[in-house]
């Protein structure tokens, strides 16, 4: 079975990046900056890909984390790139990523 720790660490790194980079900017600033929009989308893709690599048993053990939804967002970003809704990206980063960061930190502490 694959060890989940490296994938969790990737998720945590991307969450930390997103949380730090979103500070002090508005949605309007975000959508006007192609480097930032690409970076944020890429971070969400990495999070989703890392989730997909977590063993099923592990995801089931930690079922409070919305693994399926995270992986689904990754699929949508990868396969429908030209239809990306930046408002959804923005809201996800503001509302969901801090909670995911917290959950992953807790899991990493428990799984030492």
From Swiss-Prot:
A Pfam family this chain is assigned to: HepT-like
Assembly information from the UniProt record: Homodimer, probably forms a complex with cognate antitoxin TTE0751.
Name the UniProt record assigns to this protein: Putative RNase TTE0752
PANTHER family (alphabetical): RNASE MJ1380-RELATED, UPF0331 PROTEIN MJ0127
Ranges spanned by the short sequence motif RX(4)HXY motif, renumbered to the chain: 74-81
First-level EC class: hydrolase
Organism (species): Caldanaerobacter subterraneus subsp. tengcongensis (strain DSM 15242 / JCM 11007 / NBRC 100824 / MB4)
Modified residues (O-di-AMP-tyrosine): 81
GO molecular function: nucleotide binding; RNA nuclease activity
Biological function: Probable toxic component of a putative type VII toxin-antitoxin (TA) system, probably an RNase. Probably neutralized by cognate antitoxin TTE0751. Neutralization may be due to AMPylation by TTE0751.
Phosphoprotein recorded as keyword: yes
């Amino acid at each position: 079975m694959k060890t989940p720790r490296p994938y969790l660490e990737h998720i945590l790194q991307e969450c930390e990046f997103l949380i730090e980079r979103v500070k002090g900017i508005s949605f309007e600033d975000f959508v006007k900056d192609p480097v930032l929009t690409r970076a944020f989308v890429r971070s969400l893709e990495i999070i989703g890909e890392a989730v997909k690599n977590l063993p099923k048993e592990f995801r089931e053990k930690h079922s409070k984390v919305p693994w399926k939804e995270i992986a689904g967002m990754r699929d949508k970003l990868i396969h429908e790139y030209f239809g990306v809704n930046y408002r959804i990206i923005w809201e996800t980063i503001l509302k969901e990523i801090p909670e995911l960061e917290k959950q992953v930190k807790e899991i990493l502490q428990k799984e030492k």
